[in-house]
Amino acid sequence: MAAGRLLLYTGLSLALCALGMLAVAICSDHWYETDARKHRDRCKAFNTRRVDPGFIYNNNNNLPLRASRSRLDRWEGKLLRARNRRQLFAMSPADECSRQYNSTNMGLWRKCHRQGFDPEIAALIRKGEIERCTYIKYHYSSATIPRNLTFNITKTIRQDEWHALHLRRMTAGFMGMAVAIILFGWIIGVLGCCWDRGLMQYVAGLLFLMGGTFCIISLCTCVAGINFELSRYPRYLYGLPDDISHGYGWSMFCAWGGLGLTLISGFFCTLAPSVQPVPRTNYPKSRPENGTVC
């Protein structure tokens, strides 16, 4: 009896902690973060380089450090041609610096400039010229598509916008359903604990496991959406330079922690009724005599 009660109380406590962690993750804006300080410093150094006639600027990528094609065998020639093809379609430093990259942090609802990472952006925010945070759209809008592009590229961007929109909707929708199911399971578990009903405790555990499943779907969809945004075409519009560091923030880890606590609480609440002994009644069982029950 004591072991079952301990499992039940532990499961309900972990479920309550999981609800708190998921609520913090949903309300915060640190699911995904970027740091563009190195890129900004490199672009400043590139724009302030010497341009006088007596100075010759030679990029490291153009230094003659490779052998001639006549001395390469067939396999090395293929590798060299593939590398030349990649360099042909890659962005030059001037093209990368022509587009402004900011240090941002993003959540389910907003995308914000990170505080203390860009003094120029911070000054514009203090003046009120730009907003620190912008809300993420969950509806399709053609205003975000550039106008001066070819028809095929515009069609590809439009299709990618719909796909990214579906991924964002799935992430927010499944996360909301997960929190609602876990909250409903916690209420059922508390009522089952007060009324000493093993079936209600078992149902609460199943609801916790179901909520954890929805949470897994939401987090996996969020990761897939971020990877899709980074691999969109054309790369010069949606890709990130190599010197911009990016990764998941503490909100994402808070959501994964809530997922783990939800699954553990579901296991404990499902196991608790089987540990408790079956209540015995003081009334004797009726026995059949001559085809009738006495």
UniProtKB/Swiss-Prot annotation:
Residues 1-23 form the signal peptide. GO terms for cellular component: membrane. Keywords: Glycoprotein, Membrane, Signal, Transmembrane, Transmembrane helix. It is a multi-pass membrane protein. Its main location: membrane. The chain crosses the membrane at residues 172-192, 206-226, 252-272. InterPro entries: PMP22/EMP/MP20/Claudin (IPR004031), T178A/B (IPR039625). PANTHER family: TRANSMEMBRANE PROTEIN 178B, TRANSMEMBRANE PROTEIN 178B-RELATED. This is Transmembrane protein 178B. It comes from Homo sapiens.
